[in-house]
Amino acid sequence: MKLKLVAVAVTTLLAAGAVNAAEVYNKDGNKLDLYGKVHAQHYFSDDTGSDGDKTYARLGFKGETQINDQLTGFGQWEYEFKGNRSENQGSDKDKTRLAFAGLKFAEFGSFDYGRNYGVAYDIGAWTDVLPEFGGDTWTQTDVFMTGRTTGVATYRNTDFFGLVEGLNFAAQYQGKNDRDGVQEANGDGFGLSATYEYEGFGVGATYAKSDRTDKQVNAASNFNANGKNAEVWAAGLKYDANDIYLAATYSETLNMTTFGDDHIANKTQNFEAVAQYQFDFGLRPSIAYLKSKGKDIGSWGDQDLVEYIDLGATYYFNKNMSTFVDYKINLLDDTNFTKDARVSTDNVVAVGLNYQF
């Protein structure tokens, strides 16, 4: 019975997005939840950039206030503290992951603004479920609307105005962020996503298009794209029931995806697939395959940017404590391209303990 309760708790935890919040306040229509985790981990690799201590902690809150029977206000903030820095280095590389606020209008959907996930990640998240790695062929932080990003206004509708259970859609606008680092800059853009889930099965698609900044266009080189617009489309399938999780996504990007030493590919074709099983006693093994093919990379032509098999496992002691191992088997060969572009070709093993509340 105890083992079954662990499995139920883990399944609930995963369905909730790996956030097991502690309720701090709930009175008179106002609610505040606090959540966080300590992720103690170490990487082993011949690649010096992917070797060593990678410990960090995260802390966040979710709040909501009931304005009336049809209108609810909400907000969320999340911050990451690096645990592998010396005390003299202080808060170097600490970062705000999420910071947004919005309004929910009953069955008519919600609107929010701030630093949030781009709508393209609605599909990318389906395969970004590995113990440590994964989700890195086309969903990237601060790269347009493919991951966490800034200055996004998002409208979301659940169950299609309350008429079709499981049918969700979103529309998003992102304002210009003209940063010095061209890999993290973006012009004005919009994105759309739609998903439908029924009895464990899910299907979804997304599309986003943005202007590129002048700095991005002018940074064109033998490795960097020179197009004036960045685009992505993606489609995905998943099955999540009976302790089984299966998911696959296919996507194509244009003038968007970063690779190697901060380069931007003209075009990529990306595939990700993952399979997991949740045992009653807390073990969750995982296997995945990911590949990103770069197209028309300057004089280099078509090149593999990412390709690896991932073997991993997580063991949940309970809903708050887990341990994991994740082995990234890199299938890329050492070539003149990978050396010049500084694309890693080494294997990586990650091991760690995770406490979350």
UniProtKB/Swiss-Prot annotation:
Stated role: Forms pores that allow passive diffusion of small molecules across the outer membrane.
Presence of keyword Membrane: yes
Gene3D superfamilies, per the entry: Porin (2.40.160.10)
Any Gene Ontology CC annotation: pore complex
Family per similarity comment: Belongs to the Gram-negative porin family.
Principal location: membrane
InterPro entries: Gram-neg_bact_OMP, Gram_neg_porin_domain, Porin_dom_sf, Porin_gammaproteobac, Porin_Gram-ve, Porin_Gram-ve_CS
Any single Pfam family the record assigns to this protein: Porin_1
Sorted UniProt keywords: Cell outer membrane, Ion transport, Membrane, Porin, Signal, Transmembrane, Transmembrane beta strand, Transport
PROSITE patterns, per the entry: GRAM_NEG_PORIN
NCBIfam families from the UniProt entry: PRK10554.1
Protein origin, superkingdom: Bacteria
Summary of subunit composition and partner proteins: Homotrimer.
Signal peptide (from-to): 1-21
Cellular localization per UniProt: Cell outer membrane
Name this polypeptide is given: Outer membrane porin protein OmpD
Annotated source species: Citrobacter koseri (strain ATCC BAA-895 / CDC 4225-83 / SGSC4696)
Lipid bilayer topology: Multi-pass membrane protein
